[in-house]
Amino acid sequence: MEQQNKRGLKRKALLGGVLGSGGLAMAGCEVSPPGGMIGDFLRMGWPSGITPEAVSMGNFWSWVWVAAWIIGIIMWGLMLTAIFSWNAKKAEKRGEGEFPKQLQYNVPLELVLTIVPIIIVMVLFFFTVQTQDRVTALDKNPEVTVNVTAYQWNWKFGYGELAPEFAPAGGDYDGVDEARQASAEASKIDPSGNNPIHGNSKKDMSYLHFNQIETLGTTDEVPVLVLPTNTPIEFNLASADVAHSFWVPEFLFKRDLYAHPEANKSQRVFQIDEIFEEGAFVGRCAEMCGTYHAMMNFELRTVDRETFAEYIAFRDANPDATNAQALEHIGEAPYATSTAPFVSDRTGTRDGENFQTPA
């Protein structure tokens, strides 16, 4: 009897240890998950990240799946063991009663099955908060500030502050367009006046940013946002109308954009340490925003730091030049390569080819 009790305690300890190790596997927030086909499977459709913040989220996501599979296999194993080991037919063949021996009120086992899940949830919560804090932290020293304005159904990107290395004339650079910014400020509504929605109005554009160097999307041309690699970057977001959402899938992160973000208690700024991969990455609006929401794409084009400085210098020296001309100047494809403009009329979408190639 004493030996059976010892065996039972050993089994419970083993079960607790295995379940606990599943919880501790969640602690792999900064440990790279397996690569190859196993890594692809664990990502469950998530793309590879191109920022340190995205890598942190991707690693955490993969290790949560590792822990979930460990716990799932254990629980499925216990369930199947119970199904096939203790059933009425086998008991009848053995000459036993219809029901197996009842083992309720096993206090040690109940404690294990209560405490271990609590520990797993606590570990998961801890590393969720840790990863979230890293992703949302505003502790970088950004060398490029991008002002993002969303509107139905396109995007406007403007360059605000730039580090001296990227500034056209060197030194500190503030890319604000003073005339248009002053006009926007003049539209501000007096909150003490007799105005709708607590003093805010859609005519009030004072919260938006207007810059000297901007890229504006149109129905015929997907806007291409050019950014440097290996550079801390800040994104300042706002909507000119309804709620939108700025999403680059390779960031593994999205942030909603609102009109009057401060009044709506929303954080309009996020930062990234760097983008460590050059290339073209599609960006999308991830918030249902009306009729042509599905067509509201943009492209993120990342280049090295020297090429980005050349791009900014060309845009500054040639204010009437298009973004396509600036991209050609630095040896890049002039139009988006990861997505294409959509045909917006109903008749143009019936053949399944609902996109167009820029002229």
From Swiss-Prot:
Membrane topology: Multi-pass membrane protein
The enzyme's E.C. designation: 7.1.1.9
Cofactor: binuclear copper center (CuA)
Gene Ontology biological process: ATP synthesis coupled electron transport
S-diacylglycerol cysteine-type lipidated residues: C29
PROSITE patterns found in the cross-reference section: COX2, COX2_CUA, PROKAR_LIPOPROTEIN
Lipid sites, type N-palmitoyl cysteine: C29
Protein name: Cytochrome c oxidase subunit 2
Binding site residues for Cu cation A2: C285, E287, C289, H293
Region named Disordered: 338-359
Co-factor: note: Binds a binuclear copper A center per subunit.
Binding site for Cu cation A1: H244, C285, C289, M296
Signal sequence extent: 1-28
